[in-house]
Amino acid sequence: MLYALGHPASFGVLLVSFVVGIVLHGWVQGLAAVAMGDSVARLEKRNKPEPRVHIDPFGAVGALIGGLGWAHPIELPGRRDRRRAVVVALVGPAVNVALGVGLLLLWRAALNGGLSAGEAAVWGHAGGAGTDLQHGFSFAGDALGFAVLLAGASQLYLGVLSLIPIPPLDGGRLLFALAPSTLGWQRARHHLIGQNIGLVVVLVMLVLPLGGRLLLLAVLDQVLAPLLRVLLGV
């Protein structure tokens, strides 16, 4: 995101989208947890839309450097309550993805015109969206259209990033919450969560380039390119 400072409008949209997306993500997870009987989430005010509660400092670093980050992890109940673990872990990413899809469909239906056919094709084939989330671009012409487009992509990528099965991301925390209590899984949990190796892995993949591109953004570009082709109509 810091690389987008050369494009102030892009930087502003990315910053607002990140904060809104993270707060929504953590808030709905907190609401779901409290609704399903989690008193700890209530005490920690996870069911309140307060940015300081939901913004994770390491996730914010990832967003500032790599363009994407994650919310402060919420405690999952584990195997003793599989249903609650699944619902709480997945509701946050689902909200981000739904918001992203909605914004991109809004752009296509009502605001199309800010992105050329060639630029849209880059987003839908090989996925230039990840690069734009990191570096931004100039809002030449239809500023509102560009803002909606960039915010939509930001939310979509944020939601899918959260599903990657590496802690502290939601997908990784859900994986270990549901994992059996075998020695192998306990060792993996100790290293990836207890010693924060998972956090280091995610940050490295998100902020260090591989062949000129950030690894996680490159992976997300490939995964999301087919969906972007449909949403953007290219």
Segments the model singles out, each with a brief description of its role:
Residues 1-234:
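Hydrophobic transmembrane alpha-helices and their immediate loop junctions
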